[in-house]
């Protein structure tokens, strides 16, 4: 197998395994990984417009998250209100229940990050540089870059 082919399948397998593990941990909360990403994005950056939220989501990069948001609004986790400066715009914020679940999601994520940190060796920087270069300019790469910039 070529190195590039092996890398492609390793990235795919790691993404699928990470998503599977996260989905398994989120199941008792009644959340999907995409819904959890919305809650965490709003917890960190609310209020956000639908477009503003969409620009930060890796799970929905390049598309509008309106159906995803509709589902969590219906569950009472997110409030959708007219914008403060433009009544035609919509602002999204977490409800108290959404805030509670977001904190639980954050704790699950921290446990997952601790596992990843324990596995990461001294060359992790090289791996991160490669992955950043690989996704640079893509819709998901731009969404991730925006999230990183906002967190700094």
Which residues are covered by each model-predicted region?
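C-terminal regulatory/oligomerization modules of transcriptional regulators
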Residues: 1, 122-152
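N-terminal leader segment of winged-helix/HTH proteins
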Residues: 1-29, 77, 91-92, 96
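Residue-level recognition of alpha-helical structural elements
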Residues: 3-7, 61, 120-124
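Amphipathic alpha-helix face/heptad-repeat signature
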Residues: 7-10, 14, 68, 101, ...
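Alpha-helical linker/hinge and terminal dimerization helices associated
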Residues: 14, 18, 57, 101-120, ...
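N-terminal helix-turn-helix DNA-binding core of bacterial DNA-binding proteins
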Residues: 20-61
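Helix-turn-helix DNA-binding helix
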Residues: 64-65
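Charged, amphipathic alpha-helical coiled-coil/dimerization segments
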Residues: 70-129
């Amino acid at each position: 197998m070529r190195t590039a082919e092996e890398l492609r399948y390793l990235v795919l397998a790691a993404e699928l395994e990470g998503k599977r593990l996260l989905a398994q941990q989120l199941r008792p909360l009644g959340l999907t990984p995409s819904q959890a990403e919305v809650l965490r994005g709003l917890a960190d950056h609310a209020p956000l417009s639908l477009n503003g939220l969409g620009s930060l989501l890796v799970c929905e990069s390049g598309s509008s998250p309106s159906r995803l948001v509709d589902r969590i609004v219906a569950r009472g986790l997110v409030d959708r209100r007219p914008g403060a400066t433009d009544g035609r715009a919509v602002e999204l914020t977490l409800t108290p229940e959404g805030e509670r679940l977001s904190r639980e999601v954050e704790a699950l994520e921290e446990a997952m990050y601790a596992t990843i940190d324990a596995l990461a060796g001294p060359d992790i920087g090289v791996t991160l540089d490669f992955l950043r270069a690989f996704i640079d300019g893509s819709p998901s790469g731009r969404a991730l870059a925006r999230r990183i910039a906002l967190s700094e």
